[in-house]
């Protein structure tokens, strides 16, 4: 469900991702991004899907990693998400570049039909399955059905882009309820050589929200900034001007307070390879 800007969720990934793997630059354009997912095992949580997140190369100079053979930043999603989201992309429902004429007077069924009119015969569900090269009884098709894309219900948004229509439809399904609890997961995997031996260090963090208002997302986004501002006001940060938090005098006290006061904790596992 949504715990941050819904529009950003719908438009996420709409730029070529770039990273380095085995010493080579890799580029993944938007139309392939969710198809080229990787499986990642999260410490104590099991498998998740990961797709490359924009420009991983930005972090090389910031962290002094200009000569490493592998660097990739990814977004984690539950297993099955990437295939379903790729279906929305292939249909064309994440396009934010053009308004659909008379969109306020057509149904979701009619909208989807306009995308697959060239496919002959069968129900709308069967023709969408042809477009996606999926069985009509596949899980992805069930997910599109659950979302409400086959309903003969009016969209009721005039001159809306496909992305806006999708966003509003997702808001119906993905709005946090008061009793809901979100979950944030972050994991770093670092391979390095020390003393002639190769190691893998995994540092993993999981945080659950309290309810639909006090979310894990709001804590992990808001608390670091709040702690930093307090440190500045207390005169404990000497840096001046616009800074990013990669200095020890910033990240050490912030991480320490996050762990001690708010249970934002990274667990680590070290393995000899």
How does the language model describe each region?
Residues 1-273:
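C-terminal catalytic/substrate-binding lobe primarily of soluble NAD(P)-dependent oxidoreductases
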């Amino acid at each position: 469900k949504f715990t941050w800007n819904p529009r950003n969720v719908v438009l996420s990934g709409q730029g070529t991702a770039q990273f380095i793997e085995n010493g080579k630059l890799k580029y993944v354009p938007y139309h392939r991004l969710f198809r080229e997912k990787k499986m990642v095992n999260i410490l104590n949580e099991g498998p998740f899907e990961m797709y490359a997140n924009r420009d991983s190369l930005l972090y090389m100079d910031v962290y002094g990693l200009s000569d490493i053979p592998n660097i990739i930043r990814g977004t984690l999603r539950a297993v099955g998400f990437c295939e379903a989201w790729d279906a929305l992309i292939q249909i064309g429902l994440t396009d934010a570049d053009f308004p659909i004429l008379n969109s306020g007077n057509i149904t979701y069924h009619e909208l989807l039909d306009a995308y697959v009119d060239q496919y002959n015969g069968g129900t709308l569900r069967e023709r969408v399955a042809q477009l996606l090269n999926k069985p009509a009884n596949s899980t992805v098709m069930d997910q599109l059905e659950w979302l409400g894309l086959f309903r003969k219900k009016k969209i009721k948004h005039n001159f809306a882009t496909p992305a806006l229509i999708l966003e509003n439809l997702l808001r119906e399904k993905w709005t946090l309820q008061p009793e809901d609890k979100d979950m944030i997961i972050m994991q770093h995997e670092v391979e390095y050589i020390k003393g002639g031996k190769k190691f893998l260090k995994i540092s993993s963090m999981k945080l659950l929200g309290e309810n639909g208002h006090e979310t894990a997302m709001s804590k992990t986004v808001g608390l670091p900034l709040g702690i930093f501002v307090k440190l500045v006001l207390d005169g404990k940060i000497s840096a001046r001007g616009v800074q990013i938090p990669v200095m020890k005098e910033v990240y050490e006290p912030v991480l320490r307070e996050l762990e001690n006061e708010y249970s934002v904790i990274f667990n680590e596992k070290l393995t000899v390879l």
